[in-house]
């Protein structure tokens, strides 16, 4: 476990070497930290600025062990890395921030809103839907317009559709691939 705050010269591990990982690596380097990136892509953008690059799947045990050996603390560049990998790093004794629970909750919009409400944080009204029929019913209950979002792996507006009328919900559900969704009332 790392003694926080970290001292310059220590290594920050990052799961993910995309553009966000690159920006985080550059900022860490300016503050005097080394960065170790774990990413499945050999030419990940963050690898160009990180002190260490580990090319492995996010849940590859040897890759995780290599990252744990290098890093005083580990984070992740986005919420779509496997929560189990973050849990494995924590089990190895590596300080991981945010932790596995935060990542798991953030990976599912329904779980996220339910968690927030359970802990006293208000959200817009919402309803889950696993079928086109359930989506139509959810919009009828919440009122239109409503924002339909995939429960997992959406980002930067991807995986979202505005539903202007309950009758449009089945079409929007199909456009999003038929995966489980959450509908949010317009604020």
For the regions a protein language model found, what residue spans apply to each?
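Glycine-/Pro-rich loop/turn segments that contact NAD(P) or position catalytic residues
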Residues: 104-145, 160-163
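Conserved ATP-binding module of the ATP-grasp superfamily
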Residues: 122-124, 145-148, 159-187
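CheY-like receiver
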Residues: 66-67, 115, 138, 171-175
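Short catalytic-loop micro-motif centered on adjacent basic/acidic residues
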Residues: 73-76, 98, 124-125, 182-185
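Glycine-rich beta-alpha junction loops
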Residues: 42, 152-154, 187
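Short secondary-structure boundary segments
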Residues: 78-79, 150-151, 185
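Acidic/polar active-site rim loop that often engages polyanionic ligands
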Residues: 94-96, 115-121, 149-157
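ATP-binding N-terminal substructure of ATP-dependent carboxylate-amine bond-forming enzymes
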Residues: 1-107, 111, 133
């Amino acid at each position: 476990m790392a003694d926080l705050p970290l001292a310059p010269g220590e290594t920050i591990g990052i799961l993910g070497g995309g553009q966000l990982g690159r920006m985080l690596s550059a900022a860490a380097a300016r503050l005097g930290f080394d960065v170790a990136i774990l990413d499945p892509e050999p030419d990940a953008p963050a690898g160009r600025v990180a002190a260490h690059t580990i090319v492995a799947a996010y849940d590859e045990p040897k890759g995780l062990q290599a990252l744990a050996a290098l890093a005083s603390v580990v984070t992740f560049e986005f919420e779509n890395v496997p929560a189990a990998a973050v849990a494995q790093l924590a089990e190895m004794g590596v300080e991981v921030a945010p932790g596995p629970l935060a990542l798991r909750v953030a990976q599912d919009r329904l779980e996220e809103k339910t968690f927030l409400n359970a802990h006293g944080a208000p959200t817009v009204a919402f309803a889950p839907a696993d079928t086109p029929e359930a989506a139509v019913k959810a919009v009828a209950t919440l009122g239109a317009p409503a924002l339909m979002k995939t429960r997992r792996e959406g980002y930067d507006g991807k995986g979202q559709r505005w539903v202007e009328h309950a009758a449009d919900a089945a079409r929007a559900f199909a456009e999003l691939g038929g995966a489980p969704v959450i509908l949010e009332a317009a604020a």
